């Protein structure tokens, strides 16, 4: 049956229909090939926005650098990065005047964090540029490699486990004449296969030592690796994002901690809160402006968009802000916080993999690595690429591009929010000293501006003044993309406000459905998503019930577990029918074993195993949840697991769901093809860390949330813990004398082995 889509909107208020215009159903677009072109675009654009600045050369690495700070006063309409230091400092001073003690208190809180943070803070996060291997790695591996190299180069402060001490090593490493690193390499050789008698290529992985001189090391320490941002909806062109190495990460973390503490105290900041808390915060600002615009005043709201926020921000500006914010603090603290912006002023952008060339006639493919772009003949490239390469060539040093201005995506979200809020703060009547005044909301590069004035001319004047003030600190409000409306209707960070926030349900659409982790987790996540949307996103009972039925259907198709009495034939139906026939209480079978669905919108919070426990046959229970069943015991499940769900907007969210360990909570094995590549050595390292950590957490169950602090090694700690536990168990009669003696013997053997080593 064809449905005329306009019929769907006959009785729907306009604000509820807005979400249907979002590009959120279906798969998001992914990028293919290399990000080299996008990265060159970013570098070239950033320099273009600051082109009237001063050129200097970094004496350490010989990189040309462009400094637009205090450059010519910005022009109308053209985005530019010419922030004026005195204006930024003045905005900071007024922010402090309106919020007495805000900087002082935030500094004290941050100082406490700085002294307590452990190095393992840096293991959080996904892909990280690993400077030792010159490519991306999981954060934990990159950190481990860095520490390993530091220790082999006599940098040992990090052994205390404090992040602060690791950063001391980073500082010292930059003064060393050379650093010795271990790199992985591949040897290929042709050998004859004994079985098939064919020639095959055999790969062996080797590790070799390599020395980096000071210049090469500094370049790597200051490098941001670039990739293409994936899964961005509603855009035609892809764009590049950056991932910094371990030397920069720690310093950035402390700066962002300080900025986060400041943002928490600012009512106009949309960070670091999220969800319903954020909505409440925003609603307060709107309420304040609407209440104050008495009958005599007009109130308008701009749904704002800034042009190229990151590319016009400048690390030198952030340095000025930090210098001001920490001005009465101890010297060591000021130094630690100023290093991140200084490193960013000297950053280098790695251009990615390079370009792929294909010759259709000769059926040849070859890759031109990014390092060769400086010297290769440009006749092979098309015009647009030629222009890009010509522009970027003067900036290249050893195949990386010097990128002093600009910030790259997502590095200082909190600190740039503080800058944005400081301009919103200047809209108070006492500062504008005229009939118009403004307030608003800022969340990284997204803003909403509310202007009140007695008449339209006043509103226009207020907007103009805001626009110009922003220009002075390197913020470029886009006149083309921002729009103004009577206060009461606007959009901010994909929240639609219409006399209150309307649920933008389409944003959640991608997270409905079967996640593909395993049967147990998928069932749990599926119902939790529906439950959460009933709580947070106006998902009504009837729609929720329908969503649930669709989910169960989807789930049954995904895992081929249709009800035991169905006529549908699948690979599993034969086994499931057999199970169905020999089960007395058929209601007790899990959906994934061909049982009926017992979920409705009232019991979504109960894990399926618990929901059906009383209804299960004894022998079914015994197979399903028996820890001695090899299909159960393989996986230890915390009582709460967390899954990654993909909302349509923003980063993947971690969502908690209840988990019960059954035969259905299997873990898929890792793809074997990785085992034959150069990643293999890294994989083995990773597994070793994983095993050590798992073992450690067996001895210290609380270690998953509170890291032990102290100087003894992990092994010493585990041995002493084992002895204590064994004695307690022996004295309380939980273990026999022989077992106790055996444990003690093992402990002594381990200590003996350590001494010999």
Swiss-Prot record:
Subcellular location: Host nucleus; Host cytoplasm
A GO term for molecular function: RNA-directed RNA polymerase activity
Domain of life from the UniProt record: Viruses
Record domain RdRp catalytic: where: 286-483
Gene3D superfamilies: 6.10.140.720
Segments of this protein annotated with the region Promoter-binding site: 249-256
Enzyme class (EC, first level): transferase
Principal subcellular localization: host cell
GO cellular component: host cell cytoplasm; host cell nucleus
GO biological process: DNA-templated transcription; symbiont-mediated suppression of host gene expression; symbiont-mediated suppression of host mRNA transcription via inhibition of RNA polymerase II activity; viral RNA genome replication; viral transcription
InterPro entries xrefs: RNA-dir_pol_NSvirus (IPR007099), RNA_pol_PB1_influenza (IPR001407)
Keywords of this entry: Eukaryotic host gene expression shutoff by virus, Eukaryotic host transcription shutoff by virus, Host cytoplasm, Host gene expression shutoff by virus, Host nucleus, Host-virus interaction, Inhibition of host RNA polymerase II by virus, Nucleotide-binding, Nucleotidyltransferase, Phosphoprotein, RNA-directed RNA polymerase, Transferase, Viral RNA replication, Viral transcription
Region named Disordered: 54-82
Reactions the enzyme catalyzes: RNA(n) + a ribonucleoside 5'-triphosphate = RNA(n+1) + diphosphate
Motif (Nuclear localization signal): 187-195, 203-216
UniProt PTM: Phosphorylated by host PRKCA.
EC id: 2.7.7.48
Function: RNA-dependent RNA polymerase which is responsible for replication and transcription of virus RNA segments. The transcription of viral mRNAs occurs by a unique mechanism called cap-snatching. 5' methylated caps of cellular mRNAs are cleaved after 10-13 nucleotides by PA. In turn, these short capped RNAs are used as primers by PB1 for transcription of viral mRNAs. During virus replication, PB1 initiates RNA synthesis and copy vRNA into complementary RNA (cRNA) which in turn serves as a template for the production of more vRNAs.
Quaternary organization: Influenza RNA polymerase is composed of three subunits: PB1, PB2 and PA. Interacts (via N-terminus) with PA (via C-terminus). Interacts (via C-terminus) with PB2 (via N-terminus); this interaction is essential for transcription initiation.
Family: Belongs to the influenza viruses polymerase PB1 family.
Name of the molecule in the record: RNA-directed RNA polymerase catalytic subunit
Gene: PB1
């Amino acid at each position: 049956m064809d449905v005329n889509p306009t019929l769907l909107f006959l009785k729907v208020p306009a604000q509820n229909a807005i979400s249907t215009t979002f590009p959120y159903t279906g798969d998001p677009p992914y990028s293919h090939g290399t990000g080299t072109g996008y990265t060159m675009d970013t570098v070239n654009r950033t320099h273009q926005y600051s082109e009237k600045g001063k050129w200097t050369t970094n004496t350490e690495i010989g990189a040309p650098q462009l400094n637009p700070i205090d450059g010519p006063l910005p022009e109308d309409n053209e985005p530019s990065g010419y922030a004026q230091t005195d204006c930024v400092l003045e905005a900071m001073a007024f922010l402090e005047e309106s919020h007495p003690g805000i900087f002082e208190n935030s500094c004290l809180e941050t100082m406490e964090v700085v002294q307590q943070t452990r190095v393992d803070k840096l293991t959080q996060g996904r892909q990280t540029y690993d400077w030792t291997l010159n490519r991306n790695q999981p954060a934990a591996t990159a950190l481990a490699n860095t520490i390993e190299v530091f220790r082999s180069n006599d940098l040992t402060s990090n052994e205390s486990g404090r992040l602060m001490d690791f950063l001391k090593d980073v500082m010292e490493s930059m003064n060393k004449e050379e650093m010795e690193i271990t790199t992985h390499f591949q040897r290929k050789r042709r050998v004859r296969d004994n079985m098939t008698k064919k020639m095959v290529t055999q790969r062996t992985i080797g590790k070799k030592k390599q020395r980096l001189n000071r210049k090469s090391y500094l370049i790597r320490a200051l490098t941001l690796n670039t990739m293409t941002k994936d899964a961005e909806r509603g855009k035609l062109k892809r764009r590049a994002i950056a991932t910094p190495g371990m030397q920069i990460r720690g310093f950035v973390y402390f700066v962002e901690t300080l900025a986060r503490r400041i943002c928490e105290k600012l009512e106009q900041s949309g960070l670091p809160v999220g969800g319903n808390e954020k909505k409440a915060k925003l609603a307060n600002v709107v309420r304040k402006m609407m209440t104050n615009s008495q009958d005599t005043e007009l109130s308008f709201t701009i749904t704002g968009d800034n042009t190229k926020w990151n590319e016009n921000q400048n690390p030198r500006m952030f340095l000025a802000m930090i210098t001001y914010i920490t001005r009465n603090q101890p010297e060591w603290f000021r130094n630690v916080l100023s290093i991140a912006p200084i490193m960013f002023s000297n950053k280098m952008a790695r251009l990615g993999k390079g370009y792929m060339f294909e010759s259709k006639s000769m059926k040849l493919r070859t890759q031109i690595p990014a390092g060769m772009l400086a010297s290769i003949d440009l006749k092979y490239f098309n015009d647009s690429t030629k222009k890009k390469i010509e522009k970027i060539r003067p900036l290249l040093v050893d195949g990386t591009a010097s990128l002093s201005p600009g910030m790259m995506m997502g590095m200082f979200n909190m600190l740039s929010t503080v800058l944005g809020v400081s301009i919103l703060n200047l809209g108070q009547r006492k500062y504008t000293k005229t009939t118009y005044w403004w307030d608003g909301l800022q969340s990284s590069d997204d803003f909403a501006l509310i202007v009140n004035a007695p008449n339209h001319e006043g509103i226009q004047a207020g907007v103009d003044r805001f626009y110009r003030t922003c220009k002075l600190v390197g913020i470029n409000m886009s006149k083309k993309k921002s729009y103004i409306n009577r206060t009461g209707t606007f959009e901010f960070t994909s929240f639609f406000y219409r006399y209150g926030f309307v649920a933008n349900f389409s944003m959640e659409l991608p997270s409905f459905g079967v996640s593909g982790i395993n049967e147990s987790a998928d069932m749990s996540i599926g119902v939790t998503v529906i439950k959460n949307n009933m709580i947070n996103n106006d998902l009504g009972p009837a729609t929720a019930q329908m969503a649930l039925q669709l989910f169960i259907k989807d789930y049954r198709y995904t895992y081929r577990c249709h009800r035991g009495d169905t006529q549908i034939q699948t690979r599993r139906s034969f086994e499931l029918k057999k199970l169905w026939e020999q089960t007395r209480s058929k209601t007790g079978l899990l959906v994934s074993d061909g049982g009926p669905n017992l979920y409705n919108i009232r019991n979504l919070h109960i894990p399926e195993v618990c929901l059906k426990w009383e209804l299960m046959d004894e022998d079914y229970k015994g197979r399903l949840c028996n820890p001695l069943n090899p299909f159960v015991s393989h996986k230890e499940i915390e009582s709460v697991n967390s899954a990654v769900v993909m909302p349509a907007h923003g980063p993947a969210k971690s969502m908690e769901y209840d988990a019960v360990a059954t035969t259905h909570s299997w873990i898929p094995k890792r793809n074997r093809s990785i085992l034959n590549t150069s990643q293999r050595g890294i994989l083995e390292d990773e597994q070793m860390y994983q095993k050590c950590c798992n073992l450690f957490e067996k001895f210290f169950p609380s270690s998953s949330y509170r890291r032990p602090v102290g100087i003894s090694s992990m092994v010493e700690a585990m041995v002493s813990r084992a002895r204590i536990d064994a004695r307690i168990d022996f004295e309380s009669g939980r273990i026999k004398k022989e077992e106790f003696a055996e444990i003690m013997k093992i402990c002594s053997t381990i200590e003996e082995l350590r001494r010999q080593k």
